[in-house]
A protein has these predicted regions:
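Anionic-ligand binding patches
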Residues: 18-183
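N-terminal glycine-rich phosphate-binding loop and ensuing alpha1 helix
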Residues: 1-28
Length: 183
């Protein structure tokens, strides 16, 4: 298991007009890597590898991030109802080089999710739980939102928010063991 600590960073996650889901994720993940690396350097923190990630739901090239209000969550769920959409997570594992440069390796995971058609009552009841409020696309497959999912093609953990296999591949790239028995 990898020991970790949370490093709080702040990046602008607003969409840019005509930006597709993949371009958006690439930009946000790179911004997060840069912000984390700069914070480590500026605050003279221990030079440890750092992981950043961001997840979006997309349908017909439209990005569905986290809803900002209950009304926004309601609109998102209504639009995703009865669709097959994509959940994409961009992840990067960064580190500070000996020359104090921010370096990183990056990966993505894509999962197709088929959502059943939702009634207005189902959407309203779900939004009232407040579960949608911190989830890309306004639903959580690991919670009550699972009742809306007819099926997935790809990585379940990606839909939850962190694709484990892709994360392990990045750790392997930097020779970081994630097994409790150290190599």
């Amino acid at each position: 298991m990898v020991d970790f600590e949370v490093l709080e960073i702040d990046v602008d996650e607003d969409e840019i007009q005509n930006e597709g889901p993949q371009e958006y994720l690439n930009r946000i993940v790179k911004s997060k890597v840069t912000a984390a690396g700069n914070k480590i350097l500026q605050e003279n923190l221990t030079l440890k590898p750092f992981l950043v990630a961001d997840t979006v739901v997309s349908h017909k090239n439209k990005i569905f991030g986290k809803p900002t209000t209950k009304d926004h969550a309601h609109r998102m769920l209504k639009e995703l109802s009865g669709t097959t959409h994509t959940v994409t997570t961009g992840i990067a594992l960064g580190h500070i080089s000996e020359s104090k440069e921010i370096k990183f390796v990056q990966n993505h995971s894509h999962t197709v999710v088929e959502m059943k058609s939702l009634s207005a009552k189902e959407i309203e009841r779900y939004v009232l739980t407040e579960e949608p409020m911190d989830k890309a696309g306004g639903y959580g497959i690991q919670g009550l939102g699972a009742s809306f999912v007819k099926g997935i093609g790809g990585c379940y953990f990606n839909v939850v928010g962190l694709p484990i296999q892709e994360t392990c591949l990045l750790l392997d790239d930097l020779n970081i063991s994630y097994w409790s028995n150290k190599d």
